Amino acid sequence: MFLVNSFLKGGGGGGGGGGGLGGGLGNVLGGLISGAGGGGGGGGGGGGGGGGGGTAMRILGGVISAISEAAAQYNPEPPPPRTHYSNIEANESEEVRQFRRLFAQLAGDDMEVSATELMNILNKVVTRHPDLKTDGFGIDTCRSMVAVMDSDTTGKLGFEEFKYLWNNIKKWQAIYKQFDVDRSGTIGSSELPGAFEAAGFHLNEHLYSMIIRRYSDEGGNMDFDNFISCLVRLDAMFRAFKSLDKDGTGQIQVNIQEWLQLTMYS
């Protein structure tokens, strides 16, 4: 979709096959992950509707302004290349070759990972880390992860897409553990800014408040699956913004079709 095609071009920076994987693959992938270090109401007349619209636009303008400021400081890893699984580089490291073999076991005959398969493998991995508080990765979370990484709109992740996502999850897991200073298994609201900055996201207070309301519990604590889900979406949205802001002004223009593609398939 538009979102992924945009951020993959940007510079800088379902079948449930998982159930039959067995403990071996889950154990190996568990080792890989630990290797990283650890509007206004319209009723009552036209005047009310107009006031609500103005309020909504001011809120939206503030959010977009905050995102543009943050995006200017974000330097993501290079996006995954669009290469087929069979295009094996001669100079691949043994670690990458091992990961490719594991991917073949996980992906099955179609050599792509569905949202259900992604959910199964992530939940196998987090069970090996009791220090990470989580309710588990749900299917909606995994569908969102697949959607923002799905460059060819197949609804599944190819090898490079999956490897890019997996490497980010490893990096963010290490950051999560580092900033869980009270060892509660969650990231508190006071710990969150440092964790996000370590991941490369410099946000203002307004955006932090929005993120806490969306991804944290009533006490302001964010568990591991919500932390990963939030960062996956931030990474994708920042890439999309940077690729659309071709002249570097911090402003973009999109039509309704582009806006719907940005917001609905993510």
Swiss-Prot record:
InterPro entries documented for this protein: EF-hand-dom_pair, EF_Hand_1_Ca_BS, EF_hand_dom
GO molecular function, one term: calcium-dependent cysteine-type endopeptidase activity
Keywords: Acetylation, Calcium, Cell membrane, Cytoplasm, Membrane, Metal-binding, Phosphoprotein, Repeat
Residues that hold Ca(2+) 1 according to the record: 107, 110, 112, 117
Chain sites annotated for binding Ca(2+) 3: 180, 182, 184, 186, 191
Modified residues (Phosphoserine): 6
Positions of Ca(2+) 2 binding: 150, 152, 154, 156, 161
Subcellular location: Cytoplasm; Cell membrane
Domain notes: The contact of the 5th EF-hand domain from each monomer allows the formation of the homodimer and also appears to mediate the contact between the large catalytic subunit and small regulatory subunit for the formation of the heterodimer. EF-hand domains are paired. EF-hand 1 is paired with EF-hand 2 and EF-hand 3 is paired with EF-hand 4. The fifth EF-hand domain, left unpaired, does not bind the calcium but is responsible of the dimerization by EF-embrace. The first four EF-hand domains bind calcium, however it is not sure if the binding of EF-hand 4 to calcium is physiologically relevant.
This protein's name: Calpain small subunit 1
High-level lineage: Eukaryota, Metazoa, Chordata, Craniata, Vertebrata
